[in-house]
Amino acid sequence: MKEKDKVLQALCDGLGEKYEIMMIDLERCIYRNFGNRFGVEVSGVHTTKQHKKATIYLWCMDETNDHGYIIKKVSDVPRNRIGKTVEELYEYSENLISQ
């Protein structure tokens, strides 16, 4: 396993059981499915550079969960803020559903 794969796995493990590593648009990313037709992609962290900031995309998926579109993007997220930012996006998705 390459060092950057180990770093990505450690970051994913640190975020918790709800997160997994997936290939999205030819990039190894961290993904979390919210279970409400929304999910997040944590991009830009498949590297050994600890100072590299993430870009987090909020996706809205279709009924089959095969196709989706990005409805919100949060850039320049430090690694120690990824979990908190994802929780904020979860709340945002729940608010969209309740409207």
PLM-predicted stretches and their roles:
Residues 40-44:
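A short acidic-to-branched-hydrophobic micro-motif
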Residues 1-37, 53, 61-86:
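Negatively charged, low-complexity tracts enriched in Asp/Glu with abundant Ser/Thr
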Residues 47-48:
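Catalytic phosphate/metal-binding cores of nucleic-acid and nucleotide-processing enzymes, i.e., regions
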Residues 1-2, 95-99:
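Short intrinsically disordered terminal tails
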Residues 87, 93:
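Divalent cation-coordinating acidic motifs and surrounding scaffolds
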